[in-house]
């Protein structure tokens, strides 16, 4: 197999990033407009923080969080229940030969950010930073 001369690092390729961003934007628009035929899902405001795609673009993992943080378990279940309809809507926008299979995970970025802030507020860490 030929080596990819444009990407040799451990991170995602430009194509993965571009496709992930298009999926994120499309998913956000669909959820904001309430295009999904599920009243439970349409009642919730959902933030799509990031979408990561596999190197072969067959799987897309969307990191989601309900606005306000309430109902986190329900969000993943509702999105998974409606992933066929969401995948069809994304496929129309993407224009790829194959539409990636959607997987949903809770976005824990804000939790990690709070932990980092708390760590920097500790006296021992503050002393180390001042030195």
From Swiss-Prot:
PROSITE patterns: RBFA. Transmembrane segments: none annotated. GO terms for cellular component: cytosol. One of its GO terms (biological process) is maturation of SSU-rRNA. It comes from the Bacteria. Signal peptide: none annotated. The keyword Cytoplasm applies. It is found in: Cytoplasm. Its main location: cytoplasm. Keywords: Cytoplasm, Ribosome biogenesis. Pfam families: RBFA. Gene3D superfamilies: 3.30.300.20. InterPro entries: KH_dom-like_a/b, RbfA, RbfA_dom_sf, Ribosome-bd_factorA_CS. The keyword Cytoplasm applies. GO terms for molecular function: ribosomal small subunit binding. Monomer. Binds 30S ribosomal subunits, but not 50S ribosomal subunits or 70S ribosomes. One of several proteins that assist in the late maturation steps of the functional core of the 30S ribosomal subunit. Associates with free 30S ribosomal subunits (but not with 30S subunits that are part of 70S ribosomes or polysomes). Required for efficient processing of 16S rRNA. May interact with the 5'-terminal helix region of 16S rRNA. PANTHER family: RIBOSOME-BINDING FACTOR A, CHLOROPLASTIC-RELATED. Belongs to the RbfA family. This is Ribosome-binding factor A. It comes from Ruegeria pomeroyi (strain ATCC 700808 / DSM 15171 / DSS-3).
């Amino acid at each position: 197999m030929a080596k990819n001369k444009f990407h040799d690092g451990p991170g995602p390729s430009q194509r993965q990033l571009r496709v992930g961003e298009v999926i994120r934007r499309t998913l956000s628009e669909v959820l904001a407009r309430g295009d999904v035929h599920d009243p439970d899902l349409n009642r919730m405001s959902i933030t799509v923080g990031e979408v990561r795609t596999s190197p072969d673009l067959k799987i897309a993992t969307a990191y989601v969080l309900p606005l306000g943080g309430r109902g986190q378990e329900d969000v993943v279940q509702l999105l998974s229940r409606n992933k066929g309809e969401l995948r069809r809507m994304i496929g129309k926008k993407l224009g790829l030969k194959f539409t990636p299979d959607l997987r949903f995970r809770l976005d824990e970025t804000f939790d990690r950010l709070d932990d980092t802030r708390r760590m920097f507020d500790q006296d021992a860490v503050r002393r180390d930073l001042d030195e």
